[in-house]
């Protein structure tokens, strides 16, 4: 059921009514065409808002409807009401439903609003038990001022200086940390008594004065019905489109990028909208369709000038796919109910770069939004619902993330039938197993004797990155350090496909900061 935007005092921003419609011949023209409206696409559009350029954002989806079902665990998880992606395929054949959403704002409409910075060391070579995480062609210092700008844009709450892995910052968080509710504060105190240093997670939610966040149980994994999540749509793109500073074309899937005869520039994009062909002409193109879809677009754009795929003379397009090693971790104290509403406030980085018995990096521990029975029954339909209600009513729910390493054979390809095929073999699992072991020990000491874990598979790809990585050597990278394609004069990439490594924290803030950096340091604005 739809919910009106004109409720008195709601402060809600309805979708704009000034969306682009192609000309009768199916053409749309702009100075800059941004393909994708997720974190990378909407943030680069925001960065270009006062450039004097005609900026067009092209999104394959529409605005996600605001309706009561936004906050229904049954609708969102059991009935998959908002899942609208095509199937992808694993290398050995089986299809899977990827964790992607095609709406204005992309996956940020459903993300948990966790917005951490990468650690300073994450941008250099880091030795792991199973290999080396390679250095980026930029440093943390290059990105730091743009981290500050991104935190301001998305309204991040946090507390600096809580643990030693935290990188230096030139500005404080825009807003103070979201406090723990009593059950999570007890857990934080129990962990601190073990010598650990639990932190307040950096969160992009509108919990400040005048903000609309009600700290509900339906944030992480749900769309926000009150526009209080710092997503790419509400925080960055929608205000610009409503004001006319950026234009938006929805419902349009870009299928190819076409180049001039010499292959040095892209002249136009080809797409489909409501079954009709669309041609998008621009002087500059920014690709931000997500790590898998951006790589697939480059591969689908093969031509005489680029026979192996656009900008793929190095055979690097689609390679080095990373997605994190992640485990869903549920700890239960059957003696004590967890009545927390907004659970996602606590994190641990004590083992990020290692432990006393493990000299290599382990990763990050963070709370999830509060687990509810319908969210579990979607994955475990055979389980009695009464049991699931009891378990989720007595659990704390965490997400454990370890870095996976970039390897050539983990890659995205497009099959002869135009299917997206993901070749993915997990690596660096020894570190992840150690992270699960250390977390289990600490959580049990904190009073939760029952622990259930489930390592995420190929379909859990919300942290995907690395398929069009940046670098200084065109033989081993697709993009230069300003994220322009080595082989093209007028194409940039601002999603996570540019990442050289995955680190071990959520990528959203780094995507946004890098998009702001690209707008500031590249010749995107000045290219003729």
Ranges and model annotations:
Residues 92-99, 117, 136-140, 146, ...:
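FAD cofactor-binding and catalytic pocket of flavoenzymes
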Residues 103, 260-261, 272, 480-481:
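Short, acidic, Ser/Thr-enriched surface-loop or helix-capping motifs
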Residues 2-7, 127-254, 457:
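Conserved redox-cofactor binding core of oxidoreductases
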Residues 200-204, 212-219, 249, 255-258, ...:
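A glycine-rich dinucleotide-binding beta-alpha-beta segment and adjacent secondary-structure elements
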Residues 50, 61-66, 70-71, 243, ...:
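Glycine-rich loop(s) and the adjacent beta-strand/alpha-helix scaffold that form part
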Residues 2-148, 271, 287, 293, ...:
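N-terminal glycine-rich phosphate/pyrophosphate-binding loop and immediately adjacent elements
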Residues 211, 224-231, 273, 308, ...:
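Alpha-helix capping and helix-loop boundary segments enriched in small/acidic/polar residues
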Residues 26, 40, 96, 289-290, ...:
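Secondary-structure capping and boundary motifs in well-ordered enzyme cores
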């Amino acid at each position: 059921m739809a919910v009106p935007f004109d409720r008195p005092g709601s402060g809600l921003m309805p979708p704009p009514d000034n969306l682009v419609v192609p000309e009768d011949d199916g053409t749309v023209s702009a100075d800059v065409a941004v393909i994708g409206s997720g974190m990378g696409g909407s943030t680069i559009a925001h960065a270009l808002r006062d450039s004097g350029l005609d900026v067009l954002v092209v999104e394959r989806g529409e605005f996600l409807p605001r309706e009561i079902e936004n906050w229904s665990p049954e609708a969102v998880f059991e009935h998959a009401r908002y899942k609208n992606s095509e199937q992808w395929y694993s290398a050995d054949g089986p299809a899977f439903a990827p964790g992607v959403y095609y709406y204005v704002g992309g996956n940020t409409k459903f993300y948990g609003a966790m917005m951490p910075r990468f650690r300073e060391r994450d941008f250099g070579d880091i030795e792991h038990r199973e290999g080396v995480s390679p250095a980026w062609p930029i440093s943390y210092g290059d990105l730091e001022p743009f981290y500050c700008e991104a935190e301001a844009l998305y309204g991040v709450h946090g507390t600096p200086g809580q643990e030693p892995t935290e990188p230096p910052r030139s500005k404080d968080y825009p807003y103070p940390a979201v406090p723990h509710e009593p059950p999570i504060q007890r857990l934080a105190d129990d962990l601190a008594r073990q010598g650990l240093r639990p932190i307040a997670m950096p969160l992009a939610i509108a919990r400040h004065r005048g903000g609309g966040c009600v700290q509900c149980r339906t944030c992480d994994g749900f769309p926000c019905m009150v526009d209080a999540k710092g997503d790419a749509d509400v925080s960055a793109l929608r205000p610009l489109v409503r004001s006319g500073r950026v234009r938006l074309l929805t419902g349009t899937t870009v299928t190819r990028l076409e180049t001039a005869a010499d292959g040095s520039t892209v002249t136009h994009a080809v797409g489909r909208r409501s079954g009709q062909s669309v041609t998008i002409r621009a002087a500059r193109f920014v690709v931000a369709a997500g790590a898998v879809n951006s790589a697939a677009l480059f591969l689908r754009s093969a031509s005489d000038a680029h026979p192996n795929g656009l900008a793929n003379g190095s055979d690097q397009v689609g390679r080095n796919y990373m997605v994190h090693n992640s485990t869903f971790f549920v700890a239960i104290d059957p003696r004590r109910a967890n009545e927390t509403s907004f659970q996602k406030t606590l994190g641990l980085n004590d083992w990020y770069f290692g432990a006393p018995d493990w000299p290599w990096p382990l990763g990050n521990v963070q709370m999830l939004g509060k687990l509810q029975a319908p969210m579990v029954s979607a994955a475990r339909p055979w389980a009695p619902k009464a049991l699931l209600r009891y378990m989720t009513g007595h659990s704390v729910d965490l997400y454990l993330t370890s870095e996976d390493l970039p390897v050539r054979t983990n890659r995205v390809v497009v099959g002869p039938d135009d299917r997206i095929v993901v070749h993915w073999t997990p690596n660096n699992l020894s570190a992840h197993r150690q992270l699960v072991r250390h977390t289990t020990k600490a959580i049990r000491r904190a009073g939760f004797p029952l622990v259930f874990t489930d390592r995420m598979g190929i379909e859990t790809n919300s942290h995907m990155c690395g398929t069009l990585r940046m670098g200084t050597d065109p033989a081993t990278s697709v993009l230069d350090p300003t994220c322009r394609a080595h082989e093209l004069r007028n194409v940039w990439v601002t999603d996570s496909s540019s990442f050289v490594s995955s680190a071990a924290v959520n990528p959203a803030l780094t995507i946004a900061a890098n998009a702001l950096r690209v707008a500031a340091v590249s010749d995107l604005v000045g290219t003729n």
